[in-house]
């Protein structure tokens, strides 16, 4: 008898969940997965919320699934269309398409009170009118349920008093287009050309749209931020040190820089619990950024600085959409000419004088709009962008909410006791006592990508179902450090989370084990490489024959691109420091245990 598994959503998480369940079916667990997707194609948010010129800011090396890679010749960062092509090829290669049911909207999920099985009810899109749904309700019975609907579901619109006045003042203009909308409705530059544009939110989408507006020929662009952001380029190659420019052909993706050894592998529980690795990393990076770019706020970031207690990778999601920074920095950049001759960050020529002197103005969120459509900004004395905007008459013709999304699980029957991702207390994947429901893809890394995390989460969930997860699970130390008042609490450190899941399921390789099985080359790659999912398929229950080849070629390339100096600064030095720190901790732990202490 098959064990039916229903997967809701055919984005990257749903696809990898389906593929992994198929591959790990056995006599005892004959998984028979199907995927229900309410849209007419796969891809999820990458398909239906994309726009012209949009690219992934996570690298192909990290984003691609562990055993289905792009060619070495492919650019490091994919356009959204390229990524959708990749997902289609993935589904075809692993024969998932026959298991994906498109145009199926899940309307109710309840439990059979006698068997505990999940009853998943859905309707299909009407053939006569694709905007409507058929009345016929179809119900399937499943032993397992994977919820893969994603983090980006319902657009969020923070309330701003008087925003309707922008609409009223623009409605008299014929053919002017929509004047207030969410970022998911933005599709191309024609929506911004020759307009006064205001963008609310400084996440990656917000800053990307600010750049798009500048390049579209907008008359004015105002980018509004609540509390600032931390800007870093998605690849490192635009530096000049003592007149020597970095090699433009050897770009290093930012998400491939964090090393494994002693940062995520062989970390003592005391060190892990203290997060000292994150704090030391932040301390060093701030000083290096000051030396190279003149500011600690971010990489070549002269405005929009976060509060000191939130400035660092331990606290926030890095904003890797860096293209707008030359336009934002222009009124604020003030660096000593002598220091600039020692080291500097090189802005792209096409975004610099004499090609352009356009400015994107940074401002606080408006407190309200006047009846004439003018935005009123609060005075924040500690913020230089706020001081600069005081007295400015800003009357946007277009306001874009780049304010993120919330999640909704209206299909869960209220009387059936289903959890939500916030209540998934087993590694943010399942709730204790209800392991048959897995939430895949509901965490977001500070630096990294959700698709490879979804792959590791699926491996963990399958191991959990089969009773193959280590017990008891150690306490989690992978969450970003956020305050209780923060809206988003699902942030994780990519490397720490991936490594934790790998250890939980017996997929984290040992150094001696790696050398014995695969030799020095793979061992060095593991030590100096980032937390790629492929590393966790060298040993353990999800071992893959393709993993060593991927590591010896593609992942090795990310290490050699750094060069000798880069591997010293980003590899040997931090590795030596953390190894020393962990060695002392293990030594102290032995003494502590000898005298009867217990280490969690």
Identify the residue ranges that each predicted region occupies.
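Catalytic cores of eukaryotic secretory-pathway lumenal/extracellular enzymes that build
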Residues: 64-67
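Extracytoplasmic catalytic/substrate-binding loops of multi-pass membrane glycan-assembly enzymes
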Residues: 57
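Flavin (primarily FAD) cofactor-binding/catalytic cores of flavoenzymes
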Residues: 1-53, 69-483, 494-600
């Amino acid at each position: 008898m098959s064990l039916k598994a229903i997967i809701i959503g055919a984005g990257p998480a749903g696809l990898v969940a389906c593929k992994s369940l198929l591959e790990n079916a056995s006599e005892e667990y004959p998984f028979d997965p199907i995927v229900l997707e309410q849209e007419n194609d796969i891809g999820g948010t990458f398909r239906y919320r994309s726009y012209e010129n949009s690219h992934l800011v996570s690298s192909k090396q990290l984003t691609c699934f562990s055993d289905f890679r792009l060619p070495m010749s492919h650019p490091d960062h994919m356009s959204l269309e390229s990524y959708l092509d990749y997902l289609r090829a993935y589904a075809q290669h692993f024969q998932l398409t026959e298991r994906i049911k498109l145009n199926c909207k899940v309307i109710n999920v309840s439990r059979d009170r006698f068997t505990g099985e999940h009853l998943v009810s859905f309707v299909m899109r009407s053939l006569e009118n694709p905007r409507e749904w058929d009345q016929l309700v179809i119900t399937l019975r499943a032993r397992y349920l994977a919820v893969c609907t994603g983090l980006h579901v319902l657009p969020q619109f923070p309330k701003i008093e008087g925003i309707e006045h922008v609409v009223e003042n623009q409605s008299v203009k014929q053919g002017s287009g929509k004047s207030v909308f969410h970022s998911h409705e933005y599709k191309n530059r024609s929506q911004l050309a020759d307009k006064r544009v205001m963008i609310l939110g400084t996440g990656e989408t917000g800053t990307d749209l600010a750049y798009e507006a500048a390049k579209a020929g907008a008359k004015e662009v105002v980018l509004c931020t609540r509390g600032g952001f931390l800007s870093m380029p998605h690849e490192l190659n635009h530096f000049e040190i003592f007149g020597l420019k970095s090699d433009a052909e050897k770009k290093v993706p930012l998400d491939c820089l964090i090393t494994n050894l002693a940062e995520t592998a062989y970390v003592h529980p005391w060190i892990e619990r203290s997060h000292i690795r994150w704090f030391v990393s932040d301390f060093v990076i701030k000083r290096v950024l000051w030396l190279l770019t003149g500011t600690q706020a971010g990489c070549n970031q002269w405005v929009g600085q976060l509060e000191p207690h939130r400035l660092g990778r331990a606290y926030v999601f890095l904003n890797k959409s860096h293209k707008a920074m030359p336009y934002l920095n222009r009124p604020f950049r003030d660096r000593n000419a002598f220091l600039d001759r020692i080291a500097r960050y090189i802005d792209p020529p096409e975004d610099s004088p004499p090609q352009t002197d356009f400015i994107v103005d940074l401002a606080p969120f408006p407190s309200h709009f006047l009846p004439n459509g003018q935005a009123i900004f609060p005075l924040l004395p500690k913020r230089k962008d706020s001081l600069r905007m005081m007295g400015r008459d800003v009357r946007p013709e277009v306001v874009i909410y780049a304010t993120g999304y919330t999640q909704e699980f209206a299909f869960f029957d209220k009387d059936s006791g289903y959890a939500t991702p916030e209540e998934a207390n087993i590694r943010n994947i399942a709730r204790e006592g209800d392991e048959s429901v897995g939430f895949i893809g509901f965490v977001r890394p500070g630096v990294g990508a959700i698709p490879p995390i979804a792959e590791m989460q699926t491996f963990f969930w399958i191991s959990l179902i089969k009773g193959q997860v280590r017990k008891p699970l150690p306490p989690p130390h992978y969450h970003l450090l956020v305050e209780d008042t923060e809206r988003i609490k699902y942030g994780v450190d990519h490397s720490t989370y991936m490594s934790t899941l790998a250890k939980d399921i017996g997929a984290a390789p040992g150094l001696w084990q790696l050398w014995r099985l695969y030799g020095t080359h793979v061992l060095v790659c593991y030590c100096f490489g980032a937390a790629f999912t492929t590393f966790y398929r060298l040993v353990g229950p999800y071992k893959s024959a393709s993993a060593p080849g991927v590591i010896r070629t593609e992942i090795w390339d990310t290490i050699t691109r750094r060069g000798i100096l880069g591997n010293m600064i980003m590899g040997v030095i931090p590795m030596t420091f953390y190894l020393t720190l962990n060695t002392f901790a293990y030594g102290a732990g032995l003494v502590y245990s000898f005298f009867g202490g217990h280490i969690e």
